[in-house]
Structures are given as C-alpha cells and as structure tokens.
Amino acid sequence: MTFDQSNFKSLIRPVVDFPKPGVVFRDITPLFQSPKATRQVIDSFVQRYIDAEFSHIGVMDARGFLIGSVVAYQLNKPLVLFRKQGKLPADVLSEAYQTEYGEAYLEVHADSLCEGDSVVMFDDLIATGGTLIAAANLIRRMGAEVYEAAAIIDLPELGGSKRLNDLKIPTFCLTEFALDEQ
C-alpha cells in the first residue's frame, strides 16, 4: 500500500482556537474514519519497528493508545500505559511536566518496566515534547531506556522534537505541520 502524504494530511483536521484561543488543534479523528488511512499509519509504524530491538511499547494517554496498542499487538510487544494523574489503580510513579496548555502530571504503574527494558513511546503528535519527556523520565526512573519516540504528527515550530533529540531521544513522525498550515 502506497503512503499518500497529501491525502494523509488532508485527513487531519485543523481546529482553530481549540482548546484555547491561539491554538490550532490537529484532530486525528477523521484519519480513523478512513480504514485505508488507519491501515497506512499502523503499517508504517509496524514496518519501522518489526526488526528493531526493543522490549516494550509505551503509549501516552489517550490518543497514543489508538496507534500504539495496535502496533504492540502486531509486533507482540508488552504495552505500558502512561496515564493522566489519578487514572491508574495501583502503585504509580508520577512526573510533572509542562504542556502547551499548562502543567500536568503523567503516571505509570511502578512495576511496568524493569532494568534492561527498552521502550518505543507512542503519542498522536509531538508539540512541546512535554508528555514524551515526562514518560522518558519515568522510564529511566524504572531503570529502563527509551528506544525512540514515535508520533503521527510533528509540530517542529513548538520545539518538542528538538528537545527530545537534545535529550538523546530519537524521534520518528509520519508527517509534520507548520503552525499556520491549514
């Protein structure tokens, strides 16, 4: 199946001034309304990681769950859930971080990873990088390492990919948008 970048990008809806004025939200729900586009996304990630040497897939609450869980299934990898504060029932590790919207906390079950584990992290997009950096900090606190951060969309003008790369976390995104791109 050929990856059609322009058609793919047309399925990501820009929503101006959401969730607050001045933000252009990249809505991926139309992408998931197209089985062909969804398959292209999943297949692209599966092909990237099928021969890679890592042990777990970490998914960010909530849109990272959509892609990462299917990729984990396809690659037969354990899934680690990184959730918003207060959503996990057992002992957790917590990490504060800044988003483009304000401060938040990311949590993970404290027994999710062990020393020597290696994790590909999945989210829907990389904006400021705050969520993925918080997840990387949690991964490292458990003695594991980050293999790569993966997302559907990169918003390079917000600096998240650069911040991740500066922290020696490689990134992989299927597409990118300029902030003013419609």
Curated annotation (Swiss-Prot):
It is an enzyme of class 2 (transferase). It catalyses: AMP + diphosphate = 5-phospho-alpha-D-ribose 1-diphosphate + adenine. Pfam families: Pribosyltran. InterPro entries: Ade_phspho_trans, Adenine_PRTase, PRibTrfase_dom, PRTase-like. Its main location: cytoplasm. GO terms for cellular component: cytosol. Its EC number is 2.4.2.7. The keyword Methyltransferase does not apply. GO terms for biological process: adenine salvage; AMP salvage; purine ribonucleoside salvage. Belongs to the purine/pyrimidine phosphoribosyltransferase family. Homodimer. This is Adenine phosphoribosyltransferase. It comes from Pseudomonas syringae pv. syringae (strain B728a). The lineage of its organism: Bacteria, Pseudomonadati, Pseudomonadota, Gammaproteobacteria, Pseudomonadales. The gene is apt.
